[in-house]
Amino acid sequence: ISKLVNTDLDFEMLQSLLVGNSVEFYDEDEKIKPGIDNCQYTLGTIRKKKLRKVMEKGKELKEPAQSIYMIPETFKIARILFYEFGPDRSFDAIYSEYELKDSTQLFPMKMNYTIKAQKTVKIDLVYSKIVLNEEQTFPFKIPENYEAISIKEKK
């Protein structure tokens, strides 16, 4: 995925994308511009008008752009859109079918991801069951005939 979107993805970024949380690829010093588009709140690194020109006319961006679309009633993320330099280089994540889990947290049960680069990759993800904040165990036994080895670090 990192090669397709031309950025370093760490575990926290990937986890955020899988559960519908915000992911920021923009420069921390960059100003975020608020707006409203199709009855959703938006936050983006470029104005809506400029983004539409890029989307409709295939113009190239001078810098990467990010837009986040939020559902007004819940302020949950409906869509995260990243545009990269060059035509047809983008990452689009759409979150839908939010359900209340543990009577405290809204969680997207359906996600659609589209990565456009030299090739287009589409991933549709639907959760059937989600359990939050449950402690995980990994039970295993080490065989008696196991001999421990030590690994030396390379310098």
Residue ranges and their predicted role:
Residues I32-E144:
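Gly/Pro-enriched, hydrophobic low-complexity segments
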Residues G20-N21:
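Scaffold/interface architecture of coatomer-like assemblies
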Residues Y26-D27, K31:
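Phosphate-interacting basic helix/loop segments used at nucleotide- and nucleic-acid interfaces
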